[in-house]
């Protein structure tokens, strides 16, 4: 190799950039189980339901919340880990809500649409087998049908 020092410098720069980007994430270093624990505890304080952005652990105030089909019917702490895993690979949003008909608390990986995008949100909901979408700013549920 003609320029080994150049190669070492580039390798060092890339390593530093990679490490700093990993540590900048608010959930870097937290296991999937630890994130699920935090969200589980959050759900205990929000018995009627919530929408939570995992990176900031804050509740978005606006948007149309639509659940992904892949995480439907998730009720237990173990199933919540699956929901968190899916959310981290997609939009970073988790939703939870209590169903008074069956007395179960549901967790979903959620996609958030802008509030002026009701038609695309309803289309996505239908594609994902959802019965409704939720408009966060209004606290309003809109039926898909």
Where are the language model's segments positioned?
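Bacterial N-terminal signal peptides that target proteins for export
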Residues: 1-8
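Hydrophobic helical h-region of N-terminal Sec-dependent signal peptides
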Residues: 9-16
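C-terminal motif of bacterial Sec signal peptides marking the signal peptidase cleavage site
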Residues: 18-21
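Conserved, structured core segments of small domains
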Residues: 26-145
């Amino acid at each position: 190799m003609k320029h080994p020092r150049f190669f070492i410098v580039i390798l060092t720069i890339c390593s530093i950039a990679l490490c700093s980007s990993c540590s900048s994430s608010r959930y870097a270093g937290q296991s999937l189980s630890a994130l699920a624990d935090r969200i589980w505890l959050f759900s205990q304080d929000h018995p009627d339901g919530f929408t939570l952005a995992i990176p900031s652990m804050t509740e978005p105030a606006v948007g149309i919340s639509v659940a992904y089909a892949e995480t439907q019917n998730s009720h237990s702490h173990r199933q919540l880990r699956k929901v968190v895993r899916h959310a981290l690979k997609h939009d970073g949003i988790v939703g939870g809500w209590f169903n008074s008909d069956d007395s179960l608390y549901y967790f979903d990986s959620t996609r958030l649409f802008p509030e002026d995008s009701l038609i695309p949100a309803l289309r996505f909901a239908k594609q994902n087998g959802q019965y409704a979408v939720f408009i966060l700013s209004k606290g309003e549920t809109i039926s898909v049908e």
